[in-house]
């Protein structure tokens, strides 16, 4: 079986971000729990017709299980959710060129839990709105402009100029 997921310091295999996070972890710096899917797994994904094969998926799920054990949180659990960020990386730094999805694991049930736990429903719904926008753009290839148009329309309807002036109910409607 090939190994697709690592926690080691290997820039060519892990990309710059993955290697830097691994190095910070090795130095004992406070880094959130995580794992890196290798550049070889990405190559395999394309060779498999843009599908994640069973072997890679099994290792990703194993890494998520390990994160759950360490954090005490569970991916997909509405009461104690594990939220993750997915960041792409290359060997060399390419600011603004690589995709990111924050708060993977949020859904309509989890966002309600997050709103109650944080005491800040506006923040929770804004996180969810941003997650949907990022996921739609990066994964579903739905352009950001459609979301920006909806936000602009909502601001116009509410008579406000800034996104931060929209309240939790506004963001929930979006």
List where the protein language model places each region.
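Nucleotide/phosphate-binding sheet-loop regions of phosphoryl- and nucleotidyl-transfer enzymes
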Residues: 1-174
């Amino acid at each position: 079986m090939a190994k697709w997921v690592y926690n080691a310091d290997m820039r060519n295999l892990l990309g710059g971000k993955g290697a830097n996070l691994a190095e910070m972890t090795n130095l004992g710096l406070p880094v959130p729990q995580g794992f890196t899917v290798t550049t070889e797994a990405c190559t395999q994904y394309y060779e498999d017709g843009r599908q994640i094969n069973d072997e890679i998926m099994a290792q990703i799920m194993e890494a998520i299980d390990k994160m759950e054990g360490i954090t005490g949180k569970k991916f997909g659990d509405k009461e104690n959710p594990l939220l993750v960020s997915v960041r792409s990386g290359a060997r060399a730094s390419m600011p603004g060129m690589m995709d990111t999805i924050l708060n993977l694991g949020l859904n309509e049930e989890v966002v309600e839990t997050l709103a109650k736990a944080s005491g800040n429903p506006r923040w929770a719904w804004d996180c969810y709105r941003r997650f949907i926008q990022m996921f739609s753009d990066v994964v579903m290839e739905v352009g950001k402009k459609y979301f920006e148009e909806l936000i602009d329309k909502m601001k116009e309807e509410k008579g406000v100029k800034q996104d931060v002036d929209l309240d939790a109910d506004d963001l929930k409607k979006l």
